[in-house]
Curated annotation (Swiss-Prot):
One of its GO terms (biological process) is DNA-templated transcription. It comes from Spirogyra maxima. Its EC number is 2.7.7.6. GO terms for cellular component: chloroplast; DNA-directed RNA polymerase complex; mitochondrion. The gene is rpoA. DNA-dependent RNA polymerase catalyzes the transcription of DNA into RNA using the four ribonucleoside triphosphates as substrates. This is DNA-directed RNA polymerase subunit alpha. Residues 1-232 are annotated as: Alpha N-terminal domain (alpha-NTD). InterPro entries: DNA-dir_RNA_pol_insert, DNA-dir_RNA_pol_RpoA/D/Rpb3, DNA-dir_RpoA, RBP11-like, RNAP_asu_C, RNApol_insert_sf. GO terms for molecular function: DNA binding; DNA-directed RNA polymerase activity; protein dimerization activity. In plastids the minimal PEP RNA polymerase catalytic core is composed of four subunits: alpha, beta, beta', and beta''. When a (nuclear-encoded) sigma factor is associated with the core the holoenzyme is formed, which can initiate transcription. The lineage of its organism: Eukaryota, Viridiplantae, Streptophyta, Zygnematophyceae, Zygnematophycidae. Gene3D superfamilies: 5' to 3' exonuclease, C-terminal subdomain (1.10.150.20), DNA-directed RNA polymerase, insert domain (2.170.120.12), RNA polymerase, RBP11-like subunit (3.30.1360.10). Belongs to the RNA polymerase alpha chain family. It is found in: Plastid, Chloroplast.
Amino acid sequence: MGQYTINLRESYPVWKIGSKIDSTKEECLDYMLFIASPLLAGQATTLGVAIRRTLLESIQGTAIVAAKIYGAAHEYSTLEGIQESIHDILLNLKQVIIKNKICEFQKCLISIIGPKKVTAADIELSQNITISNPYHHIATITKPIRFQVELIINKGRGYLIQDGNDVQDGYFPVDALFNPVRNVNFSIHNLAEQQEALILEIWTNGAITPLDALRQGSENLIHLFLPPFGLEDDTYMTSLGSQDYNIHIKNSLKEKFELHSIERIEDSHLIKDQFLEYSKTPIELLELSTRPFKCLKNANIYTINDLLKLSQQDLLKISNMGPSSVKQIVEALDKRFGINLKLK
């Protein structure tokens, strides 16, 4: 029977920012790519799934939850001198992105005399609140009249769907998307010595940065795992502590654990096969310095698979690529993936 050696590593993975794209006036979307490595086999999947679920479900945000539009009879009515219907104005208010550092509940005001195009920048806010998309269109005033709206903003998680007919004190309910995280992707890439790297991509709406979202999500996960550390061996339900009951529970758990272990082993093989190729492994994992990294990018070399199609002599032919840069690439390939790049 063969012997297997498991290398138990005491160190923790290093997190780095691979790339970053800030939002523009036209598209309010922040993007960051994070790299966590080295991880033991299987850890990247555990980490990636947990972080993705947390970021998409539990990050707190702020949104407009109600609006009182002066002169509006009902949601589908119109106002003289206002181009949009009340319904369209409410939909536009729903897409206003709010940064809120402190306050949970607050009232805000729009009070503008036309003619004018009303944008999110026209919302009067307190010092602790700002708008991430100030150029977002709300309404068009076509006549010299006053357009006045009272807004209620609040903090929350997830998505709030409200009854459109539930109008209280003249306030129309506004469906609210609180979560500032718009999308999360992760991929797993094999390194040398049975280690893995996790690449995590996060998009946010500009209310918080992807880095802040990652920090908040990590804190939420930490709080989920803290309670077991306060348990002691004798803190169990003695009312259900009979010997027969304990034997039954142990047998049930043993059966479930054995079945679950088999399924997990099969899943791990599927995952390893899925990410075995280097065609989707970005060169960011090499952790190169700026010069060789930019040279590779300018030569349209984006993945490890692209790099392996070339030899060391081919790399020297790339513009601005010197011997020291090639040496750094060769050493990084060997260190991170156990790959020896061919000379010619």
